[in-house]
From Swiss-Prot:
The active site is at C382 (nucleophile). Its EC number is 2.1.1.176. Gene3D superfamilies: NusB-like, Sun protein, domain 3, Vaccinia Virus protein VP39. One of its GO terms (molecular function) is RNA binding. Specifically methylates the cytosine at position 967 (m5C967) of 16S rRNA. It catalyses: cytidine(967) in 16S rRNA + S-adenosyl-L-methionine = 5-methylcytidine(967) in 16S rRNA + S-adenosyl-L-homocysteine + H(+). It is an enzyme of class 2 (transferase). It comes from the Bacteria. The keyword S-adenosyl-L-methionine applies. This is Probable ribosomal RNA small subunit methyltransferase B. S-adenosyl-L-methionine binds at C259, A260, A261, P262, G263, G264, K265, D283, D310, D329. Keywords: Cytoplasm, Methyltransferase, Ribosome biogenesis, RNA-binding, rRNA processing, S-adenosyl-L-methionine, Transferase. It is found in: Cytoplasm.
Length: 447
């Protein structure tokens, strides 16, 4: 067996993720780039890494009865057992014997015969005896958390906020890989024509479920195609596309995107403005500001001005009442995108949301004076955590009586999401439409 077998590459990626706490989506991109893989093997690698990572707690629960002294087992061997068990329990297309054989071969090369024998023994025992049932866990929250590999505290938080049934739906949909969605650049393309052109070139696509400029990519990737390179489409989740619609920017207006990287929402705003007016896009990190500029260049958008700046100091640079509309797409816990970044389930802590809420509120406080009277302030996050969403907005409006909920938000959003809009706020949970979890709140400045 060659060192570069797909399973060995997957194991190497899992080891790096565990050691470096790297983002899974970024690491996987770099691993794919550095290994020459066929489309089929690229798909298998993605499946193995994401699947093993996404089901880590469940896999450890299944492995536990078969490992006598887990503290003595090397971390890479645990990763190998998880990877192999994932194939045995979750991937019907891979025969158990193939998964076990590959695991033993990898163990021989990476370790020695003793480790190979141990790996073989554990996996053969599982094959013979079967894994323990999750039904043995009496507490329903703990059972759900274990079966769907979420931290127990997080499942409890969702159950308290939305009810146990909704928490279960959130957890289960997180285990289903998301489809890639594209936003059509209406400055350069028409969605209906683009769908026909893509189909003619063998790209499997269909209309999006929510946004009028959305296209669902059913198979393959878009980044290397001329559609992407020529700026006809951008990669963006449908719930994220609703943010610019909520802001509702018009041509010739002055808009601020206070936390803009990597630039998808800034670009959408500029497209809706027909590339007329001004969009100032801020981000704290210089390398991320570069991404905003690159996105604008690719899409042919000249009204985006990207600057490196902490939004919490924006008042030092900009005038009061300078902007018609401001978007604060705030840094957040990101629980709405767990399907795309499964590793975050294991790295986040219960007090993260309270810490982030302070940052979010401080950004809103700094930005508030910059909105013109009668102007719009939209706050959004990709999380379902009420501490970062409703509680932040409640605190902000209490402190700033010159802002009020924008009750016209509902009319600006697609019909399907309107029933979920309350008091100028929209909370999308991932199971509603199969999109990322997202929170959007629109406020008007009185006067």
């Amino acid at each position: 067996m060659k060192k570069t077998s797909v399973r060995d590459i997957a194991l190497e990626a899992l080891i790096k993720l565990e050691q470096n706490q790297a983002y899974s989506n970024l690491l996987l991109k770099s691993v794919i780039k550095s290994n020459e893989l066929s489309d089929q093997n690229r798909g298998l690698l993605t499946e193995l890494v994401y699947g093993t990572l996404q089901n880590k707690i469940a896999l450890d629960y299944m492995l536990k009865p078969f490992i006598n002294k887990p503290q003595k087992v090397k971390p890479w061997v645990i990763q190998l057992l998880r990877l192999s068990l994932y194939q045995m329990e979750y991937l019907e297309k891979i025969p158990d014997r193939a998964a076990i054989h590959e695991a033993v071969e990898i163990a021989k090369i990476r370790g020695h015969k003793g480790i190979a024998s141990f790996v073989n023994g554990v996996l053969r025992s599982i094959q013979r005896e079967g894994v323990p049932s999750f039904d043995a866990i009496e507490d329903p929250v703990r059972r759900l958390a274990t079966e769907t590999s979420h931290p127990e505290w997080l499942v409890k938080e969702w159950a308290d906020a939305y009810g146990f049934e909704a928490a279960e739906k959130i957890c289960r949909i997180h285990l289903i890989p998301p489809k890639q969605t594209l936003r059509v650049n209406q400055m350069k393309a028409d969605r209906a024509e683009l769908l026909d052109q893509m189909a003619a070139e063998g790209i499997e696509v269909e209309k999006g479920d929510l946004a009028e400029d959305a296209v669902k990519l059913l198979k393959g990737t878009i980044a290397g195609t001329h559609f992407f390179q020529n700026g006809e489409v951008s990669i963006q989740d449908e719930s994220s596309m609703l943010v610019a619609r909520a802001l509702d920017p018009k041509s010739d207006e002055t808009v601020l995107d206070a936390c803009a990287a990597p630039g998808g929402k800034s670009a959408h705003i500029a497209e809706l403005m027909k590339n007329k007016g001004s969009v100032t896009s801020l981000d704290l990190h210089k390398h991320k500001v570069k991404l905003i500029k690159e996105a604008a260049d690719r899409l042919g958008l000249t009204i985006i001005h990207a600057e490196t700046m902490d939004a919490r100091k924006a008042g030092e640079t900009f005038e009061n009442e300078q902007f018609d509309r401001i978007l604060v797409d705030a840094p957040c816990s990101g629980f709405g995108v767990i399907r795309r970044k499964p590793d975050m389930k294991y790295t986040k802590k219960p007090d993260d949301s309270a810490r982030l809420a302070e940052i979010q509120l401080s950004i809103l406080r700094e930005i508030a004076p910059l909105v013109k009277k009668g102007g719009t302030l939209v706050y959004s996050t990709c999380t379902m955590d009420r501490t970062e969403n409703d509680e932040v907005i409640h605190a902000f409006i209490q402190e700033h009586p010159d802002f009020e909920p924008d009750l016209s938000l509902e009319k600006r959003l697609p019909e399907k999401v309107r029933p979920f809009v309350r008091d100028g706020r929209l909370q999308i949970l991932p199971h509603y439409f199969g999109t990322d979890g997202f929170f959007i709140c629109s406020m008007r400045k009185k006067g």
